[in-house]
């Protein structure tokens, strides 16, 4: 670790450890990670391709699904260069500007995903509670506005983070015990007070993920009331069945996020590898599982994918 003793280098770079202490088996660890990244890319690209090429899927529900797939793809590609760089080439140094850029995209896309999940819950609410006005409420123009507002809100709230980190002097260490750059990990290396960063980080989470999760819960409360008011048991099951994929996507996103938050807040005594694994679960499991869930649980998507593979054969 020459970087630890090279003062001039420390001023320009961070040092990513990956799975520290397991360097001799990094090539083996890379196999499941490569498989996950490949599956994420193929799965989400397939979803995007199917929705784009099939005119019958040009509906609000599938537009939102395309947004989710695009966000998952971006989140995967944000971490891929440094993760595989460490495993394959032992490339552990990352310039501070590059690190802050990666941090910006990871956190922005995480917030975009939360916002897209909220938009999808609104879609389900309108489809079940106000089906006759579904196409007039969720017009293509309005869907585009919802997508753009998700990106703008997330980007504008995350944009200050690199500047808040840039003002610090990192005199203790430039070693990040991760394979990518995260705000919480970088600010721990600062010599001066991090109270401003800490408060702003909590503010961002509260007004994005916090608000989104409450509104998703509210939408499903109203959906459940509407479903229970339906006359026949078959109608209730049909209505709930259209929500299963989205509920799975919500759980896949929020449960790892809550787990990661609990580990960061109360898991100081836990081995470092637990922190690492939780961060990988949070960033990789939703992009990995969302295409699988929607392919299995959404009949239209499943049928179109099967047709594509039959055509290839």
Task: Give the role of each language-model region.
Residues 1-313:
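Transmembrane helical core of 7TM receptor-like proteins
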């Amino acid at each position: 670790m020459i970087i630890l003793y090279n003062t001039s280098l420390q001023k320009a770079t961070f040092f990513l450890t990956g799975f520290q202490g397991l360097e001799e088996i990094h090539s083996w660890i890379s196999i499941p990670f490569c498989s996950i990244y490949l599956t994420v890319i193929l799965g989400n690209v397939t979803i995007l391709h199917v929705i784009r090429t099939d005119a019958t899927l040009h509906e609000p529900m599938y537009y939102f699904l395309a947004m989710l797939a695009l966000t998952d793809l971006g989140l995967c590609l944000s971490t891929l260069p440094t993760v595989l760089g460490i495993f394959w080439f032992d490339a552990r140094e990352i310039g501070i500007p590059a690190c802050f850029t990666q941090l910006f995209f990871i956190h922005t896309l995480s917030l975009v995903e939360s916002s897209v999940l909220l938009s999808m819950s609104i879609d389900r609410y309108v489809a079940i509670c106000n089906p006759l006005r579904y196409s007039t409420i969720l017009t293509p123009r309005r869907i585009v506005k919802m997508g753009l507002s998700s990106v703008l809100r997330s980007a504008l709230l995350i944009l200050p983070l690199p500047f808040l980190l840039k003002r610090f002097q990192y005199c203790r260490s430039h070693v990040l015990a991760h394979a990518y750059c995260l705000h919480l990990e970088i600010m721990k290396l600062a010599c001066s007070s991090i109270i401003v960063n800490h408060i702003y980080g909590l503010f961002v989470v509260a007004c994005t993920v916090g608000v989104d999760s409450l509104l998703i819960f509210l939408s499903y409360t109203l959906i459940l009331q509407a479903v229970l008011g339906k006359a026949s048991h078959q109608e209730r099951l049909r209505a709930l069945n259209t929500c299963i994929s989205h509920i799975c996507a919500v759980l896949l996103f929020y449960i790892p996020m809550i787990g990661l938050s609990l580990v960061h807040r109360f898991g100081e005594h836990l081995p470092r590898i637990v922190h690492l694994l939780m961060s990988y679960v949070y960033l990789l499991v939703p992009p990995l599982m969302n295409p699988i869930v929607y392919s299995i649980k959404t009949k239209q998507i499943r049928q179109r994918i099967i047709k594509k593979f039959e055509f290839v054969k």
